[in-house]
């Protein structure tokens, strides 16, 4: 690495610290509940989950070894997908290895150039990142403001092929949630 490169990195790090944007990895050892994770109740430590993982590792190895499209879609993946589709009574679906990957894949590619996305202002950052990379135009509405959302739907209803509305079932930072009855009523009134 060149001296200029190292100096720039040092300056960038200093700027992050001054602006209180510097982050460090912290070691977390023991906790019964972790509401800052994707595993609130520590289910990954449940004996049945551990036994299932052990059995899968013995049968399939410690990973799929490839992406699903190449050779990484294993019988255990098909069984899981079939079970979910049966439970949800859906004809098809996809598996993703994380919520982040699902958000990126779906929102980056599903809305097209002639579509419009309306997103709650406080959607997860991974959703917002995906919307910045998708070909559709998007606009954010005020957090949980169903009246503003309805105004935007009414105003843009005939201007795009498809309108997508992006919100969350529970907003992870505050624990609040959208008025689902109102959202369903808007869905029935406007085709999105």
Go through the PLM ranges and name each one.
Residues 43, 70-73, 125, 146-147, ...:
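Short, small-residue-enriched loops and turns at beta-alpha junctions
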Residues 113, 133-135, 190:
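Short, structured coil segments at secondary-structure junctions
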Residues 106-125:
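Conserved PLP-anchoring active-site segment centered on the Schiff-base-forming lysine
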Residues 139, 143-192:
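Active-site phosphate-binding strand-loop segment of PLP-dependent enzymes
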Residues 2-62, 192:
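N-terminal "arm"/small-domain region of PLP-dependent enzymes with the aminotransferase-like
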Residues 34-36, 62-67, 163-169:
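Short beta-strands and strand-loop turn motifs
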Residues 51, 59-99:
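Conserved N-terminal alpha-helix of the aminotransferase class I/II PLP-enzyme fold
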């Amino acid at each position: 690495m060149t001296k200029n490169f190292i100096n720039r990195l040092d300056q960038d790090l200093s700027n992050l610290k001054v602006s209180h944007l510097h982050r460090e990895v912290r070691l977390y050892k023991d906790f019964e509940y972790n509401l800052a994770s994707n595993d609130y109740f520590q289910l990954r430590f449940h004996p049945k989950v551990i036994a299932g993982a052990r059995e899968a590792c013995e049968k399939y190895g410690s990973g799929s070894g490839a992406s699903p499209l190449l050779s990484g879609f294993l019988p255990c993946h098909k069984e899981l997908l079939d079970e979910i589709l049966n439970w949800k009574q859906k004809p098809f679906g996809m598996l993703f290895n994380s919520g982040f990957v699902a958000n990126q894949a779906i929102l980056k590619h599903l809305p097209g150039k002639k579509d419009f996305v309306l997103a709650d202002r406080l959607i997860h950052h991974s959703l917002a990142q995906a919307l910045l990379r998708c070909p559709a135009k998007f606009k954010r509405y005020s957090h949980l403001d169903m009246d503003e959302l309805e105004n935007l739907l009414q105003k843009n209803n005939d201007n795009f092929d498809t309108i997508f509305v992006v919100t969350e079932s529970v907003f992870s930072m505050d624990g609040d949630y959208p008025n689902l009855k109102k959202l369903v009523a808007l869905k029935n009134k406007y085709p999105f």
